[in-house]
């Protein structure tokens, strides 16, 4: 194991325990108190960052804009953050538009958390992809029951972004779509 690999492994191990506890605590408190939607996007202390600060700022800005668009129930604002060739396990932009539209019809005060533990750039130039390893959740108040409902959650999921029109946009997943997901996993379609 090289020094770089060992460092990355150690960073993930330390982060995993703390972030797991913190994420569970935040989600539990959020669900238990029924508070209004609130979004947090945070770069974990000790996160593995393999890009320059300008790129980190641009990536964080994408998720801050997503948080704001969700809070405002701004469907066009959310869609503007997705790449034109978005593809996540076969879901395209039209599918994501429908999912978010349905969520806004069923829930109010949507909010969530994103804890980033790694930001890495793969490739270069127009083929560059940013991989953001993230743990988080999304919840909302049901318009039917007025109860806070967990909508989506993920642990060490990877958000993929591509440079399009000079800005980073959420692009889905990279490579082949697995025919069957591993036991205990589910696709994370919302980002």
How should each PLM-predicted stretch be described?
Residues 1-15:
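N-terminal secretory signal peptides that target proteins for export/translocation
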Residues 19-32:
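Bacterial N-terminal signal peptides
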Residues 36-80, 102, 118:
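Short, low-complexity N-terminal intrinsically disordered segments enriched in polar/charged residues
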Residues 55-58, 71-77, 81-83, 109, ...:
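Flexible low-complexity loop/turn motifs enriched in small/helix-breaking residues
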Residues 81-95:
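A short gly/proline-enriched turn/hairpin at secondary-structure junctions
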Residues 101-154:
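Surface-exposed, charged secondary-structure patches
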Residues 136-142, 161-163, 178:
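Beta-strand elements of well-folded, non-transmembrane domains
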Residues 155, 162-191:
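Low-complexity, intrinsically disordered terminal/linker segments enriched in charged
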């Amino acid at each position: 194991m090289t020094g770089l690999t060992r460092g990355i492994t150690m960073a993930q191990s330390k982060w995993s325990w703390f972030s797991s506890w913190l994420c569970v605590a935040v989600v539990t408190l959020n669900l238990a108190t029924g508070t209004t939607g609130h979004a947090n996007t945070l770069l974990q202390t000790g996160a593995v960052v393999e890009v320059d600060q300008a790129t980190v700022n641009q990536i964080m800005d994408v998720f801050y804009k997503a948080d704001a668009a969700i809070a405002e129930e701004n469907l066009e604002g959310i869609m503007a953050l997705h790449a034109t060739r978005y593809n996540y396990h076969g879901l395209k932009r039209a599918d994501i538009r429908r999912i978010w539209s349905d969520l806004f019809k069923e829930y109010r005060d949507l909010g969530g958390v994103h804890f980033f533990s790694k930001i890495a750039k793969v490739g270069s130039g127009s083929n560059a992809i940013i991989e953001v390893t993230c743990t988080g959740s999304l919840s909302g108040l049901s318009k039917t029951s007025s109860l806070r409902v967990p909508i989506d959650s993920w642990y060490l999921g990877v958000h993929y972004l591509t440079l399009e029109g000079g800005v980073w946009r959420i692009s889905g997943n990279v490579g082949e779509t697995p025919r069957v997901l591993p036991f205990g996993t589910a696709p994370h379609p919302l980002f």
